[in-house]
Amino acid sequence: MTTKLQQLTQNILSSQGKLEADFILKNAQVADVYTLTWRKADIVVKNGTIVALDHSNRFHAKEVEDAAGSYVIPGLIDGHIHIESSMLTPGEFSRVLIPHGITTVITDPHEIANVAGAEGIQFMLDDAQKADMDIFVMLPSSVPGTQFENAGATLTAQDLEPFLHHEQVRGLAEVMDFPAVLNGEEGMLQKILLSKEANLVIDGHCAGLQSEQITGYRAAGIQTDHECVTAEEAIDRVEQGMYVLIREGSAAKNLRDLLPAIQSHNARRFGFCTDDKYVDELMDEGSINYDVAMAIAEGMTPLQAIQLATVNTAECYRLFDRGVLAPGYKADFVLVDDLSTMQAKAVWKNGHKVAENGEMLTSRQEAKVPAHIHHSVHLPSMTKDSLQLSFKKGTRANVMEIVPNQLITNHLVIDVPVKEGVFVPSIEQDLLKLAVIERHHHLHTTGLGIVKGFGLQKGAVATTVAHDSHNALVVGTNDEDMILALSRIQEIQGGFVIVADGEILAEMPLTIGGLMTDVPAQQAKEQLAGLHNALQKLNPTLDFHFLLTFSFVALPVIPALKLTDTGLFDVTTFQHIEVEA
């Protein structure tokens, strides 16, 4: 095995034509993401590194392939994703996305960290190391997301410190608890300070923040935001020195709204991310390739869109060895025939072809899952009394209204059906009962609320994918189906369950922390299709992504009204409120 010094020497010699290269991709239309031009060249690779772009056919290699004039772009980079939201392990996630041209992702494992703490982070790192894709980790900053709910773990600065110098760790993940930052809460500032001292990147989470609050985030050293929903917000972030990662996921779709913010003078401060995207959409669409194609369809030049998806994101996360097709950079590149679709014909990682025509060319590997992460659901036996939502004064209530395909909700104050002092769900008014039950430590705390907008005509839906604390979450038209759904969630140790008229219509077990499956992606996709089909039976007019929208109604850091296991939470005032208004 050659040493790093020997490899460096070989790379230099190979760049001068004095040593045979490992691989040459000939006759490529190479994307220059610095000058935003195309140039015809042969890409010369040694030891996984591009050592030359040859214009005169003067290099030789052990292996040669002809691009036949096709476009070749740098491997695409996702700047912010929670791999757990794909419901796949990192290794299987990698196998889904590499064929789409994604060769690097920056992940925040705060979903599994909220369930299993530091051990959850370690599992993600271990599994990521077995992936063909480069998976870099941002250390979860907000576990739990707030102090107003019960998660499976609490991560202090001391808990994160052992991970700071891990080769796959790039920084501190999205800082969601903005009052903790702006009020100078010591625990949060210690995490930020540790990251700054290690010269790591600090991600933001600036949902709904005003410009002066962004100033406070910047003063703390927070460098990115992926929560912009308007062009004006994006411009403000960039003007205050941030990188903006444009999000296009399964529920949050902000790309079209944010594109007007990108101009020639500020484009280098933008990148793409998915944040949360389900396995079926990842398999069908990909992720960042889809964003690039959409941006091109909306009028952005192909090279500009490719720049956002490669070098911009690489530089944001100080990955200065990738994102560019030039000597000295990683040999991560993608062969593309049609820029309008961005469909990858072949993908190379570190100079090795790892995917072709949508299929992986390598075998699947995976890390061992710790036993208690496989058994993480501990629910109490639920009864009608457990789900009774009482009113003392009248019928006026604080009601959560979902916004289809968005993470935000509206806060309504309206009259609701009440019979003998107890809320009664109404299909006609689309007012359903919502419950969050603590499932980590046998605390049995239960938050109850009322939600409008899901449109269920019957039945109930339950899950343990309830961002970010991932307690058990259930919505329904009646208590009996809600109780059955929760009981089944306990039996399968997490996942999704859909029930109607006392019958289980569909389920998807997620036995790894109640968040991820250990089955291959294709099988997971089929299970997810079963859930979508069952949802159509509960709501025949359903026209939005129910499951992902549903999974965020318990996240008390995104406005306006959310439900946790400790009760209804007003994100605007950052405090609990009563359901009865």
Curated annotation (Swiss-Prot):
Q: Which PANTHER family match?
A: ADENINE DEAMINASE, N-ACETYLGLUCOSAMINE-6-PHOSPHATE DEACETYLASE
UniProt source species: Lysinibacillus sphaericus (strain C3-41)
Offer an example of a GO molecular function term for this protein: adenine deaminase activity
Enzyme Commission number(s): 3.5.4.2
Any GO BP: adenine catabolic process
Q: Tell me the enzyme class.
A: hydrolase
Identify the keywords attached in UniProt to this record, alphabetized. Hydrolase, Manganese
Q: Does the keyword Cytoplasm apply?
A: no
Protein known as:
Adenine deaminase
- Record-linked NCBIfam families: ade
Please give the cofactor(s) recorded in the UniProt entry for this protein: Mn(2+)
Q: Which InterPro entries match?
A: Adenine_deam, Adenine_deam_C, Amidohydro-rel, Metal-dep_hydrolase_composite, Metal_Hydrolase
Q: Which reaction does it catalyse?
A: adenine + H2O + H(+) = hypoxanthine + NH4(+)
Q: Where is the chain membrane-spanning?
A: none
